[in-house]
């Protein structure tokens, strides 16, 4: 993948690669490097080929999906399951880059679960985007009409759709 993360430093002169992309993955990679260094100092024998294979195949090994994952081209459709203010702030930075660099309109299909910092997340989203508010098919999902009301308080504009499929198709 062109957008995957590669890191070189003195501890890993041949570099590390992960198939995950997104600005926040740099921070995650450095956390992994710190953990590996700590475990090595504690005499854990973690083989280089094991952590390299784990990082390179993290999606296949864990089933992780939706971390700044490009699922379609022309138009570009990017999926990200960011669910807290920190994650959304990283997403906002990346969306700003796309918006400014390519002068593209940004359309966001958006749903939330009801046990997160909904107001904080909504405040962290870009105001210039067009939103398609929806309810995911999970028990904890916030109804789309409630989400729209909170989004409008945060200065966001959009329309509600009862399902994710309908929101994407709109």
What is the predicted role of each segment?
Residues 6-12:
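Short acidic, glycine-rich loop/turn motifs
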Residues 12-130:
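Nucleotide phosphate-binding/pyrophosphate-handling subdomain across enzymes
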Residues 1-6, 76-78, 119-170:
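C-terminal helical cap/extension that packs against the catalytic core
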């Amino acid at each position: 993948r062109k957008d995957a993360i590669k890191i070189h430093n003195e501890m890993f002169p041949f570099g590390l690669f992960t198939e995950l992309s997104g600005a926040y993955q740099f921070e995650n990679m450095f956390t992994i490097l710190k953990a590996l260094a700590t475990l090595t100092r504690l005499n854990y024998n973690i083989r280089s080929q094991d952590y390299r294979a784990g990082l390179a195949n993290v999606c296949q090994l864990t089933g992780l999906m939706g971390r700044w994952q490009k699922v379609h081209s022309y138009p570009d459709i990017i999926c990200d399951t960011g669910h807290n203010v920190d994650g959304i702030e990283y997403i906002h930075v990346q969306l700003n880059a796309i918006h400014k660099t390519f002068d593209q309109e940004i359309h966001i299909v958006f749903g939330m679960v009801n046990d997160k910092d909904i107001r904080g997340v909504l405040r962290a989203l870009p105001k210039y985007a067009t939103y398609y508010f929806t309810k995911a098919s999970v028990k904890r999902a916030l109804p789309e009409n409630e989400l729209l009301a909170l989004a409008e308080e945060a200065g966001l504009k959009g329309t509600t759709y009862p399902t994710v499929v309908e929101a994407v198709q709109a």
